[in-house]
Amino acid sequence: MDSVKDDLKVVKERDPACISHVHCFLNFKGFLACQSHRVAHKLWLQGRKALAVMIQNRVFEIFAVGIHPGAKIGSRILLDHVTGLVVGETAVIGNNVSILHSMTLGGTGKASGDRNPKIGDGVLIDAGTCILGTLRLVFVLRLVLVLW
């Protein structure tokens, strides 16, 4: 429950479009997708993988957000305009991370084992960023994709 409170606070702090905690709780799909993932992840860890994947699939249908239930997500997370977000099974997202839309933390085709990126605390990942493989980003930085 602390993660839910922390996520609500951080959305209000970092997103100028958020007019209240209630507004976020009821309407912000990034917040809702993150909380749904927290439920699915708990089920995944309990071995209730079919139910966890069912929740993930429903979240994908509703919000166009694909966070594998095996992925680990820290607290104080902001998922802003989160359409097109994809996070693989072995990905890890640290605390105080902000992620914008159309972002991928994916693998490179490896069938098993550790195959997804690890994002450290305090990272901002801009829209359209694609990070593949077992790359570890362990310090505060801003990742940006620039299109010309």
What spans do the regions from the language model cover?
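Structural signal for interior beta-strand "rungs" in well-ordered beta-sheet cores
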Residues: 60-148
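Terminal amphipathic alpha-helical/low-complexity segments used for targeting or macromolecular assembly
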Residues: 1-63
